[in-house]
Amino acid sequence: MLRVVEQPGHQALLRVPAATRAIVSWNAGAPNGGIALAVHRSDGSVAEPLLYARWSPHDRRSLDGSDEKTRVAVDVVRSDVPFSGIGVTSTVALDAVSVAIPPPDDARVAFRARVAPLEVPPLSQTVRGFPESARSWCSPTALAMLLRFHGVDASIPDVAHGVFDSSYAGTGNWAFNAAYAGARGLRGVAAYLRGLDHVAAFVDAGLPVAISISWRGKELPGAPLPHSEGHLVVVRGFEPHHALVNDPAHPAVATRYDRAALDRVFRAHGGVAYLVAPRERTAELVALANNALPVSP
């Protein structure tokens, strides 16, 4: 489930079905800013605002605020009791703010992906002159591929610098990656999807998707690494039994994985995805994100 409010100014309240976990992401053009969140619990109480993030041209950091029932862990809000909304307050006017919660367990979408594979520029996360890139730049590289697909000239080092979270010294903060896409003139959100069938709906609409996966041993045949606790790849198309992906850690980048295996390691890792589109397609992006349907009895 995804909620997006465009041009909310400095504050917004985003209502969602009862949940205990969410990702809040935002788009803003301002070079400096800060975000605080207030969880609106399902019992009608409202938690005290928690600091979520601060950013400036030279430093971006997540802020792990917490109270007795709610905590922020880098880019995920977790609550011990259900909430039905999140209030967002920003020191700068926002272009957009979004709240994503996991879809219900009985949600599904019909597999489609009838279109030809999308022409997503293949980029490797191993960048000469940046020794840290090979082991840790999958997220900014995947985002750079999405940006270039949409006509934004983005270098991998620039993206890595723009999404770096100094609190945990990494480039994989989901909200920061969405914010960077927004700062480059696109609409970027971090969302929960139901699985590869859900991803296929975006591919059908001409929108590649970056998905977060993890695996061990033989869970993902053909993977470039024996295991990963978190890795980003871009899904650009489908064959009957395979997903066509750009894997920034793969020697060839453009490769394919068994669709069922990739679906399992995607859903097991939470089903988080980067959704990037032109701003004028925001409503369509939200509609696609929310098209999971209850399974018929």
Label each PLM-derived region with a short phrase:
Residues 17, 36, 40-56, 60, ...:
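Noncatalytic regulatory segments and standalone regulatory/sensor domains
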Residues 4, 153-296:
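Conserved active-site-adjacent core of cysteine acyl-enzyme catalytic domains
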